[in-house]
């Protein structure tokens, strides 16, 4: 008799009526009377537990089993009984239960519901709850979706370095890397990467279509529901691409990911629809069945001015060209005005990074942010400045010394046939929040790192 997994039983139980099976796993709950007991049994291969029925008359260790602490590991030998009239499609009538590992009674995740903060304090255990089992399953499939998209579209996967000598965003929010035995280990200042973009740009000149996917680090002291100190970014880069084609690529990429989740994580999405965000399935269908609008930054400013005049309450009410849009403004645009993801394009140069291509008006850059309801910005991209002189001028305007900041190599790319390039950075956890209905980014990553917290 071979060991079988719940995942396989869910697919084949109707053909296994009366068949003897062996399962190994733990239980989420147990209840018993004097003669019969019921175990909610899980082996981590499926979301919902299987009911194990055990009786005193044929279970010599009935009393021991009945008193086992939650999360104890057991081996169950029993018979498959289909139960179409009950909530669960089948159950296992046990003939033998062996205790493999008894859990300590102090196990924190008892049968009662637990709050999000409590679960964050027990991040090493929270994957055993339905919520985090579902979110992390979707996270895995979401990553697979992007790999499939880029593979199908002939992108090369580039492993960008995690230790760098520059801050590609120029925001001064990088973590410094220092060897305790040799402070001058690299011969220059070293930092954890804030973006894989520069490496992607270099490789796009050799392979045309590339992408990076890895962790990035920001030394921000933000305590919001959308910020982490360590998070994952998807950063494609395509040579010869302009801003218009870039928005098309972003839209195709996001829609492919959602289609993929419908194919490979539909039960998990349905769980999220029932437990995290009612209407989630309809929202995602609306995303894949409609175009993402494109709206100019200048038009956004006029929309916001009109909203203020009509009495809409923003915390930041001084709406003017050149302002950096706040989350409240972004969400108003995508939630109240367009009611779906929307591209804002051609931002003022003073609120965007130095490497973005200057438009002919000399005021704006060929940049875009994709704004999503409930989240705000989930993706930012741009056409890159391809003129060496313009890029150097922009650096000097922002007091960025290419030599001092180890950026000369990046500028030098423009000397050697760098005609045009565009790319974007998509916050993986933010998109995961959007497709699951998860309301805090700290719950969209296995072990969250943020200011003041490093427990695991």
Curated annotation (Swiss-Prot):
State any GO CC term: cytoplasm
Stored Pfam families: tRNA-synt_2, tRNA_anti-codon
**Molecular function GO labels:** asparagine-tRNA ligase activity; ATP binding; nucleic acid binding
EC number from the UniProt entry: 6.1.1.22
User: Which one GO biological process term can you cite for this protein?
Assistant: asparaginyl-tRNA aminoacylation
Q: Where is the signal peptide?
A: none
Q: How would you summarize the oligomeric state and partners of this protein?
A: Homodimer.
Which named protein is this? Asparagine--tRNA ligase
UniProt lists the gene as asnS
């Amino acid at each position: 008799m071979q060991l079988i997994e719940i995942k396989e039983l869910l697919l084949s139980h109707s053909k296994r009526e009366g068949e003897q099976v062996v399962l190994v796993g733990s239980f989420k709950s147990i209840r018993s009377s004097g003669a019969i007991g019921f175990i909610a049994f899980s082996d981590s291969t499926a979301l919902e537990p299987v009911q194990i029925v055990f009786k005193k008359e044929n279970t010599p260790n009935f009393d021991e089993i009945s008193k086992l602490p939650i999360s104890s590991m057991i081996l169950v030998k029993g018979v498959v009984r289909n139960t179409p009239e009950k909530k669960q499609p089948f159950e296992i009538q046990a003939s033998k239960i062996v205790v493999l590992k008894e859990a300590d009674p102090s196990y924190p995740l008892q049968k009662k519901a637990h709050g999000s903060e409590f679960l964050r304090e027990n991040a090493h255990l929270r994957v055993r709850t339905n919520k985090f089992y579902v979110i992390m399953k979707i996270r895995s499939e979401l990553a697979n979706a992007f790999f499939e998209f880029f593979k199908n579209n002939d992108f090369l996967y580039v492993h960008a370095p995690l230790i760098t000598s520059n801050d590609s965003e120029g925001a001064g929010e990088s973590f410094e890397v220092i060897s305790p035995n040799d402070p001058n280990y690299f011969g220059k200042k070293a930092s954890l990467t804030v973006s894989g973009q520069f490496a992607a740009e270099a490789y796009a000149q050799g392979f045309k279509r590339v992408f990076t996917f890895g962790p990035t680090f920001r030394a921000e002291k933000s305590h919001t529901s959308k910020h982490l100190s360590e998070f994952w970014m998807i950063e494609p880069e395509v040579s010869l691409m302009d801003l218009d084609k870039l928005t098309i690529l972003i839209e195709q990429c996001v829609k492919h990911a959602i289609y993929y989740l419908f194919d490979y994580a539909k039960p998990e999405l349905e769980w999220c629809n029932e437990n995290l965000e009612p209407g989630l399935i309809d929202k995602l269908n609306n995303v894949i069945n409609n175009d993402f609008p494109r709206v100019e930054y200048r038009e956004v400013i006029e929309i916001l001015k009109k909203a203020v005049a009509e009495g809409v309450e923003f915390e930041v009410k001084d709406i003017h060209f050149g302002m950096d849009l706040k989350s409240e403004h972004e969400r108003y645009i995508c939630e109240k005005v367009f009611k779906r993801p929307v591209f804002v394009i051609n931002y003022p140069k003073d609120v965007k990074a130095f490497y973005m291509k200057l438009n002919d008006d000399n005021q704006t850059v060929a940049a875009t942010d994709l704004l999503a309801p409930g989240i705000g910005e989930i993706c930012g991209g741009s056409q890159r400045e391809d003129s060496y002189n313009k890029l150097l001028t922009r650096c000097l305007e922002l007091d960025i010394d290419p030599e001092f900041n180890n950026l000369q190599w990046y500028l030098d790319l423009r000397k050697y046939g760098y005609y045009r390039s565009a790319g974007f950075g998509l916050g993986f956890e933010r998109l995961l929040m959007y497709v699951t209905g998860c309301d805090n980014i700290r719950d969209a990553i296995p072990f969250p790192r943020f200011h003041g917290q490093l427990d695991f």
